[in-house]
Swiss-Prot record:
It is a multi-pass membrane protein. Its main location: membrane. It comes from the Eukaryota. Residues 451-540 are annotated as: Disordered. It comes from Homo sapiens. This is Solute carrier family 49 member A3. Belongs to the major facilitator superfamily.
């Protein structure tokens, strides 16, 4: 199906792609989206399958609550160091390879968790559970960064935010499934094998789907001008020259990473927090389900809205500020007994304001850091979020104290009920801090949209007016970290598609030197169709015209 023309969309296209192929979308992009969405959902169910029934698991397997917490915390621990490697795989090896590898790791981890139930007399079942969770955590590192990459490579500009939303929100959908399904499946210790088996089935299905149905990392023809230049910097170059020096990106990464860490800690500890106030594991699962459900509903409304309006910054700031406001009443109400309606309402608001802005914030990260690869731009935020999540979760559990007064606790028998008041106030304070920093200090141009529309790129970081760093030139169009205008000059247009120089046959016309550059070397014409070939370096290079001749014009935009 042919994509919209430049006249219809108002998007300026790279000269070479426009002259040779144009932009095109493929129906199989929806298969790729389905595979990544199912994989994200399955991985999330495996992550939190134990948390909603922590007391039953601990009692039947003779484990402490600290060990149960580590079955969830291991995701954060493993994802932090291996997340960097996963970003490199995603941007350098390719989206298809990363997805298939993640699917197999996810399936292997789900099977390993079942060993204590399938083999009678297994010694130390916790080791098998932890090993399986660790493999699933490795899979998460590969797939949780994929939605923004998939949206950029396979979807046109007017569908990117929606595609990113669908793939990203499949992860909290998995959390929702775990919160609802685990308490339903596990009523007593004998039900644990059933729960583990049920969660293995979707992992096997998505493994088969990814292996058979995913054929290539990138489409033969890019769907947009931004896709044609996607991942134009190598991972280490983008990290050193752009992300670390881009003040707007650093602020977004720290604040959004903190919110990710808070959400992860909230989901993992919710059952323990509410059981201390006398609420059942079933009600805790309901609150977790409301948290995710309203987040998904909010994202379904916010994704198409941002696709139309491009209000990435406004939506992110408003959503996270409202999320912080909802954290305060939850910190207070959750420690009171009998406040079921108020708890359900606050959990719903937390999901509506917090989870719903996740996909939009990931798109904002790509816009803020362009031309850095989508995997690196979003992946570093998730890695930072996992690291912050470890610290927040450890701090919240460390700040709990034993209740001295009588309580109606429904927590595991044999353990004193805990008081989570200080821990929850810490969570609310951190939410407020991160949202205020983001609202006041974060400002950025939309660099990818500027590149696609052919507008003169912004050469200065909007935060304090400081330069974005050594990776951003202070020159004119086409030299400031985004693609320059791709509209050819009248003289260039008059020469036709061959663009030959009157000074000699086969040479690009000098009037076209400002057009969007093409890739260097023989691989230029097929770079978009080869998995992993979009991972390239920002460097000086020569243009190649359709006839294959060279010009000495240098450009910072080359895909090698």
């Amino acid at each position: 199906m042919a994509g919209p023309t430049e006249a219809e969309t108002g998007l300026a296209e790279p000269r070479a792609l426009c002259a040779q192929r144009g932009h095109r979308t493929y129906a199989r992009r929806w298969v790729f989206l389905l595979a990544i969405s199912l994989l994200n959902c399955s991985n999330a169910t495996l992550w939190l399958s134990f948390a909603p029934v922590a007391d039953v698991i601990a009692e039947d397997l003779v484990l402490s609550m600290e060990q149960i917490n580590w079955l969830s915390l291991v995701y954060l621990v493993v994802s932090t160091p291996f997340g960097v490697a996963a970003i490199w795989i995603l941007d350098s090896v390719g989206l298809r390879a990363a997805t298939i590898l993640g699917a197999w790791l996810n399936f292997a981890g789900s099977v390993l968790r079942m060993v204590p139930c399938m083999v009678v007399g297994t010694q130390n079942p916790f080791a098998f559970l932890m090993g399986g969770q660790s493999l699933c955590a490795l899979a998460q590192s590969l797939v949780i960064f994929s939605p923004a990459k998939l949206a950029a490579l396979w979807f046109p500009e007017h569908q990117r935010a929606t595609a990113n939303m669908l793939a990203t929100m499949s992860n909290p959908l998995g959390v929702l499934v775990a919160n609802v399904l685990s308490p339903v499946l596990v009523k007593k210790g004998e039900d644990i094998p059933l729960m583990l088996g049920v969660y293995t089935i979707p992992a096997g299905v998505v493994c088969l789907l990814s292996t058979i149905c995913l054929w290539e990392s990138v489409p033969p023809t890019p769907p947009s001008a931004g896709a044609a230049s996607s991942t134009s910097e190598k991972f280490l170059d983008g990290l050193k020259l752009q992300l670390m020096w881009n003040k707007a990106y650093v602020i977004l990464a720290v604040c959004l990473g903190g919110m990710i860490g808070i959400s992860a800690s909230f989901s993992a500890l919710l059952e323990q927090i509410l059981c201390a106030s006398g609420h059942s594991s079933g009600f805790s699962g309901l609150c977790g389900a409301l948290f995710i459900t309203f987040g998904i509903l909010g994202a379904l409304a916010l994704g198409p809205y941002v696709d139309r309006t491009k209000h990435f910054t406004e939506a992110t700031k408003i959503g996270l500020c409202l999320f912080s406001l909802a954290c305060v009443p939850f910190a207070l109400v959750s420690q009171l007994q009998g406040q079921t309606l108020a708890l359900a309402a606050t959990c719903s608001l937390l999901g509506l304001f917090g989870f719903s802005v996740g996909p939009v914030a990931m798109e904002l990260a790509v816009e803020c850091s362009f031309p850095v690869g989508e995997g690196a731009a979003t992946g570093m935020i998730f890695v930072l979020g996992q690291a912050e999540g470890i610290l927040i979760m450890l701090a919240m559990t460390a700040l709990t104290v034993r209740r001295s007064e009588p309580s109606l606790s429904t927590c595991q028998q044999g353990e004193d009920p805990l008081d989570w008041t200080v821990s929850l106030l810490l969570m609310a304070g951190l939410c407020t801090f991160f949202s205020c920093i983001l609202a006041v200090f974060f400002h950025t141009p939309y660099r990818r949209l500027q590149a696609e529309s052919g507008e003169p790129p912004s050469t200065r970081n909007a935060v304090g007016g400081a330069d974005s760093g050594p990776g951003v030139d202070r020159g004119g169009a086409g030299r400031a970290g985004v693609l320059g205008p791709s509209t050819a000059t009248p003289e260039c247009t008059a020469r036709g598609a061959s663009l030959e120089d009157p000074r000699g046959p086969g040479s690009p016309h000098p009037a076209c030197h400002r057009a969007t550059p093409r890739a260097q070397g023989p691989a230029a014409t097929d770079a978009p169709s080869r998995p992993g070939r979009l991972a390239g370096r920002v460097q000086a290079s020569r243009f190649i015209d359709p006839a294959g001749s060279h010009s000495s014009f240098s450009s910072p935009w080359v895909i090698t």
